[in-house]
Amino acid sequence: MPQPIFDRILPAFLYERIATVLLAQASRRGATVLTREEVIASTDAPFLIVVAESFALLLQAEPVPQMSTYRVAILTNPRAIARFLRKIRSQVPVNRRPLIRAVLQQLSPLNAKEQMLPADLAIALMAVLGEETTAQCQSCQPLVTAALNERQAQERLLHQVTTQIRQSLELPELLKIAVDRIREFLDVDRLLVGQFAQTEGELRGQITYESCRNSEIPSVLGIWDDCWQWSGLPSSSYQRLSQGEAIVVSDIQQFYGAVPCLQSFAAHWQIKSWLIVPIIVQDRLWGVLIAHQCDRPRQWQPQEVEFLTHLSQHLSIAIYQAQLYSELQQQKATLEQRVNERTQALREALSAMEAAHRIKNDFLATMSHELRTPLTCVIGVSATLLRWPLGPLTAKQREYLEIIHESGTHLLELINSILDLSEAELGRSQLHRSAFSIRQLCADCLEVVKPQAHRHQVNLRHQLMIPPTRDRFWGDYRRIQQILINLLSNAIKFTPAMGEVILRAWWKEDELIFQVQDTGIGIPAHLQSLLFQKFQQLDSSFGRAYTGAGLGLALTKQWVDLHHGWIDVDSTEGKGSTFTVGLPAISDPLPDPPKPKLDVPPLATTEVLVEPEGRIVLVSEDEATSTLICSILTTAGYQVIWLVDGEVERLLALTPIAVLLAEPFSYGDVQELVDQLRQRCTPEQLKIFILGSKGNYQGVDRYIPLPIHPESFLQQVTMGLTSLATSAQ
């Protein structure tokens, strides 16, 4: 309930002076005025109501017994003023009640909150209230002081309750403490909190909190009484409470003499007098605050009623806050449950998706392995037939064999890309780091793409800004080589005839930078975000003009990420593109390896450099690869013996001119095998080739990468045996 903006005990003449000031102000503003005399209300407490367009004011005066003073209060809350008018309406003659209705109608448009008084009116009131009055009423000073002390005590208790409301949202604890403190302050025998509940259209209530003076006072906690709805409250009383009015009964036996049921109830629970104030939460009667006097009838003082009313208002705030907190906690629990359910559903969906993804990748990997073996044989046999020494091929035969060879090679490259991508996505890709020459790496990559550049009539250049002292890099040679080959191949593919592709390399502090720049068709800005996604071609028109499965750049990105590097693209449509790769340098844990000559002639060369003669021993456990190698070397005129283990004595007993050791090396320690062979044979007597990734094996003459490309493989073997043939001469 709104509190007065002014509440003091004043001499009667000062009240009259305040009323005179208000009447003058109302007359000047054309405001409506209603006084006790106009409605002839049967009350000895004078009042004055002023209602203007922008504010309303109620001046109340309650006589102080045995003193010529009033307790003067000023309220500016329209709702409180309307409640006051409805309260006195029953005491006003019927012919005067239209005056009250008229004032109530004028109050309706005003806001329910306190209105700001006009400045001149506030100044006039302050001038009156500021005058010295104590000299004219010295006899009432002790009573005034006592009243002020009581008021201060009430305000302290209100402050304590308000503080507790702010500090705690636990309603049971708050109400339990509040009823104890209020009972002690009012000095009553029993203080109760009752709560209403609407069930199946019937109003029911129950005492939920209680504080008794001592154990002799019987407890009414949880009591329900059918007499007069609840605890002696008839429907009219319930309506009064709902409107915010208090029920004040000094002597129950006398007041409810005509209600035996209620008299019996009061006698049973030793109730002589009660004071009931409503607890209204959000304009709904939530419950009541009840004070019982059990030893005697009690004349309840206006300040006691007012104090209990103020406390009920603070409790209303606490109850509303607790309800909001409870609803919030319930909503929080509901949301948490929904989040947990949604999270679990997402986990299950993610798990199912990951399982499907793994199955797909496993299937791709399995099928790629199964397809790669026969394709390797097809490529090898077609390459062997192209060099068939027993008779010349017709033009048509050669054309068909070249189609078979090129188509098989293209399909094998696609399958290898799918296999590499599947392994990368499954997290199975591992780097096989070794030390290598950056310049030699670039030379090897340019040599691989040189035939493609020649076919497309594209000028292929390089700019290597690598000082000799920093020509060494520690990384996966095959992966980095494939990164550069993919970028160079794409650049050549999308560069028109007479265009240019440049490979650059330089150090930027501790980062090795590779850059491939072309003068090709460029990439539209809105499509550049798709570059590194698998199975992506930038436009359907590109797919018709340029072949490819859209895996090269996706694999490139995976391999760059494996090296903890980065890749960037800068492209302008119609002018060309620049791809830049940065690879961080890491420490080389191994000593410098020997530097064999790695220059490789163009792959288009098919000329045999020496006359094939002598025996070559192949050590391999892979039947398909071994069959292909034997076919290639036998067709070229070599005698080939295939072993599945690397027993040294058996190898040397065959007196080979070269030993090919193929990955995987499950047949023993390769370095130990090479050392034993080198102890018995010099490089001029025996060549040792590793078929697989480049490593740091001491005593090895040449590394030939897998899978086998027949033309390149034969060139590598022939070149490796050149020095042997020269020394034999």
UniProtKB/Swiss-Prot annotation:
Residues 1-169 are annotated as: N-terminal domain. The modification Phosphohistidine is found at H369. Residues 613-729 are annotated as: PsR domain, binds KaiB. GO terms for biological process: cell division; rhythmic process. It holds the Pfam family HATPase_c. Residues 366-587 form the Histidine kinase domain. Residues 170-314 are annotated as: GAF domain. One of its GO terms (molecular function) is phosphorelay sensor kinase activity. InterPro entries: CheY-like_superfamily, GAF, GAF-like_dom_sf, HATPase_C_sf, His_kinase_dom, HisK_dim/P_dom, HisK_dim/P_sf, Phyto_chromo_attachment. Functions in an input pathway to the Kai circadian clock. Senses oxidized quinones via its C-terminal pseudo-receiver domain, providing a link between cell metabolism and the clock. Affects the ratio of phosphorylated to unphosphorylated KaiC, binds quinones via its pseudo-receptor domain. Quinone-binding destabilizes the protein rapidly. Autophosphorylates, does not transfer the phosphate to its pseudo-receiver (PsR) domain. May play a role in cell division. In the N-terminal section; belongs to the phytochrome family. The N-terminal domain is followed by a GAF (phytochrome-like) domain that lacks the conserved Cys residue for ligand binding, a histidine kinase domain and a C-terminal response regulator domain without the conserved Asp residue that is phosphorylated (pseudo-receiver domain, PsR). PANTHER family: SENSOR HISTIDINE KINASE RCSC, TWO-COMPONENT HISTIDINE KINASE. Homodimer. Part of the circadian clock (KaiA, KaiB, KaiC, CikA, RpaA, SasA), the composition of which varies during the circadian cycle. KaiA and CikA compete for binding to KaiB(fs). The PsR domain binds the KaiB:KaiC CI complex but poorly to either protein alone. KaiA and CikA bind to the same region of the KaiB(fs) form and therefore compete. This is Circadian input-output histidine kinase CikA. It comes from Thermosynechococcus vestitus (strain NIES-2133 / IAM M-273 / BP-1).
